[in-house]
């Protein structure tokens, strides 16, 4: 009888341990307005599922002109879903082992897929496909932008999404001794391409000095009305050989005036950017200056240097005008670049004004915008286009 009781007691203990283990590994879900979250009770796994829709009306419905012929194209109005994204993120195993996936439902392609190890602030590691931390403008999410689209210079100088690995971190020293850094090695063939084709990697680096003592993230609009000024200055560079001279979410391609590479590694490219950002009491400003040197190895080492810059600022006028609606921001941007060595031969200009009404920060906002892009050749304007747009961007 004692043996029977002992057996029953042992069975009960084992069953209790199994129940406890099951309970600790069980998952629970919640929705807080910023995605549907799932997390295990023992915190070994988490998943957040988010969606984002961007509805846009534009007249005319064209993208930013990149050559003279674009101004002569008669485009109709655009109305529809401009972006539809599904985002997954969370951690696995340990809270500092993080993953992220972003899927473009409009064009049916994976934009981002990363695995990150972020145990220490000063030393972190990431592998996968994502937007290279190069220029501030491109690193800001399209859902967090101040304007509907990035400036006209973005297409010329961005490294966009690449496959590779990166070390990065933040050194938070006393006073002005606050720095962020990123160094990476990538395929250099753009989104969705697993090969670098020519055996030459893309090498990148970015150093950001947060000289007012607090790290400045990749974001636009001072929605929170920063009480203490925040500012950053950064320099970044990249070096690679490729048959491509530009990158976008669609993948790799070539700029105007550059033919598709006849040989792998035809273009030897070195480029750099200097950028800055500032936030204080509803005011936000940022600017970038770019240079990009392209050597065509298949054309007697012909060298072309592209230059461009933009300045952008936004302000919640309610901070100065009592009757101005508190969620309404006014923003403006000026940008210019030359697609050729001789800046007097050809130069593009952009002038944009936008009004943002934030229902719930960048998670739910309405934007009205007027943007004028023009082209000068030999100091005479030969093309211009003014685009009127209205956009609703909502995340859930």
List each language-model region with its residue ranges.
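Cleavable N-terminal export/targeting peptides
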Residues: 1-21
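Preference for short coil/turn "hinge" residues that link or interrupt alpha-helices
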Residues: 2, 29-31, 72-74
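Residues in intrinsically disordered, low-complexity segments of regulatory proteins
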Residues: 4-6, 95, 322-323, 391
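Outer-membrane beta-barrel pore domains
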Residues: 17-28, 62, 129, 227-396
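Outer membrane beta-barrel
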Residues: 34-191, 195-214, 219-221, 225-232, ...
């Amino acid at each position: 009888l004692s043996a029977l009781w002992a057996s029953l007691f042992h069975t009960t203990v084992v069953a209790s341990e199994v129940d406890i283990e099951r309970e600790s590994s069980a998952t629970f879900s919640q929705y807080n307005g910023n995605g549907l979250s799932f997390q295990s009770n023992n915190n070994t796994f988490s998943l957040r599922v988010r969606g984002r829709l961007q509805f846009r009306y534009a007249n005319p419905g064209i993208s930013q002109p990149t050559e003279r012929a674009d101004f002569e194209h008669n485009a109709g109005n655009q109305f529809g879903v401009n972006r539809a994204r599904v985002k997954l993120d969370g951690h696995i195993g340990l809270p500092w082992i993080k993953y992220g996936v972003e899927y473009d439902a409009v064009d049916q392609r994976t934009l981002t897929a990363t695995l990150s190890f972020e145990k220490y602030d000063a030393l972190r590691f990431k592998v996968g496909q994502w937007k290279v931390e190069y220029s501030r403008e491109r690193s800001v999410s399209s859902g967090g932008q101040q304007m509907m689209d990035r400036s006209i210079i973005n297409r010329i100088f961005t490294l966009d999404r690449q496959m590779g690995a990166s070390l990065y971190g933040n050194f938070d020293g006393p006073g002005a001794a606050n720095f962020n850094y990123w160094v990476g090695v990538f395929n250099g063939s753009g989104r969705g391409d697993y090969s670098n084709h020519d055996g030459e990697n893309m090498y990148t680096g970015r150093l950001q000095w947060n000289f007012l003592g607090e790290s400045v993230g990749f974001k636009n609009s001072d929605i929170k009305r920063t009480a203490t000024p925040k500012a950053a200055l950064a320099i970044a560079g990249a070096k690679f050989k490729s048959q491509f001279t530009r990158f976008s979410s669609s993948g790799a391609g070539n700029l105007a005036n550059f033919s598709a590479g006849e040989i792998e590694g035809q273009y030897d490219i070195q480029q750099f950017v200097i950028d800055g950002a500032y936030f204080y009491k509803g005011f936000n400003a940022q600017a970038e200056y770019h240079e990009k040197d392209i050597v065509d190895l298949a054309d007697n080492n012909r060298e072309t240097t592209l230059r461009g810059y933009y300045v952008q600022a936004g302000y919640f006028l309610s901070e100065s005008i009592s009757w101005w609606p508190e969620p309404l921001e006014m923003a403006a941007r000026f940008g210019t670049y030359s697609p050729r060595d001789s800046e007097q031969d050809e130069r593009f200009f952009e002038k944009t004004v936008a009004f943002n009404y934030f229902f719930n920060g960048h998670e739910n906002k309405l934007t009205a915008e007027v943007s004028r892009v023009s082209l000068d050749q030999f100091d005479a304007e030969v093309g211009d286009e003014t685009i009127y747009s209205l956009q609703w961007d909502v995340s859930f």
